[in-house]
């Protein structure tokens, strides 16, 4: 499973950390104040093909590292499969975002990408990763997953539940607090200090006592906190499976 974890690490880098806000917005044809209003993004458009293709090409860049554990011919085939499948899945996701809940689309989108990577793991004949790198791959997988992907998932859940809410960027204060919260939850879960997790939630809640008097804020706070906690627990469970 270590090779699969490596594929997931490369996927996370390509899909979340090499994708700029502009590409993410433009591939979904979201015309706004920060948009130059490309001719492809007319009113009612579902996607911008140019940016879907740009993202798909950038996405496969991290996978070039697989040359260390496979031959060039196999690598070329893997890169081609990943680029084409990613473009197709993302194009469908862009269309679906206009039709249904973005949280559902996001989860299905990532599930499909994960299945494609698993098939590559099973049938591409990749060489094994030396045990010396096992810990680094596992830690990278957990850290990368706890940051951007979990933050985006929470943001999309908030967007679906509270349509008027403003999405937070990865490095906004709220997102940073959420990231630190998830990291601490995973660390304490790894150490078996479950009581410390309760303390984190207690301190966080105490710090927002005044704001919690507002019903709307209270609902947002509870949903965001619970979603963040659940995602952290799921990441820890995935770590244990690697």
Give residue ranges: language-model regions.
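Short, aromatic-rich membrane-interface segments at the entry and exit
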Residues: 72-79, 131, 195-199
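Alpha-helical transmembrane segments and their membrane-interface junctions
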Residues: 187-204
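Short hydrophobic alpha-helical segments that form membrane-spanning helices or hydrophobic packing faces
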Residues: 22-23, 62, 120, 199-203
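Interhelical loop and helix-boundary elements at the membrane-water interface
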Residues: 16-56, 89-188, 207-231
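Alpha-helical transmembrane segments
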Residues: 1-9, 74-81, 134-147
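Transmembrane helix-loop-helix
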Residues: 63-85
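Juxtamembrane boundary at the C-terminal end of a transmembrane helix
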Residues: 233-242
């Amino acid at each position: 499973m270590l090779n699969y974890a490596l594929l997931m690490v490369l996927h996370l880098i390509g899909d979340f950390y090499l994708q700029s806000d502009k590409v993410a917005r433009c591939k979904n044809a979201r015309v706004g104040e920060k948009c130059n209003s490309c001719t492809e993004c007319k009113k009612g458009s579902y996607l911008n093909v140019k940016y879907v293709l740009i993202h798909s090409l950038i996405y496969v860049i991290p996978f070039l590292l697989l040359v260390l554990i496979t031959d060039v011919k196999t690598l070329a085939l893997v890169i081609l499969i990943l680029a084409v499948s990613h473009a197709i899945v993302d194009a469908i996701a862009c269309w679906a975002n206009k039709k249904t809940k973005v949280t559902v689309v996001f989860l299905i989108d990532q599930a499909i990408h994960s299945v494609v990577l698993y098939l590559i793991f099973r049938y591409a004949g990749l060489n094994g990763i030396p045990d010396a790198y096992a810990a680094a791959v596992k830690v990278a997988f957990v850290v990368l997953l706890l940051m951007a992907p979990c933050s985006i998932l929470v943001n999309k859940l908030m967007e679906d539940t509270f349509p008027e809410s403003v999405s937070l960027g990865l490095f906004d204060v709220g997102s940073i607090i959420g990231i630190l919260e998830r990291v601490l939850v995973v660390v304490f879960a790894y150490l078996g200090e479950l009581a410390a997790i309760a303390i984190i939630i207690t301190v966080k809640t105490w710090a927002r006592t005044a704001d919690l008097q507002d019903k709307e804020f209270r609902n947002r706070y509870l949903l965001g906190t619970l979603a963040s906690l659940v995602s952290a627990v799921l990441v820890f469970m995935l770590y244990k499976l690697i």
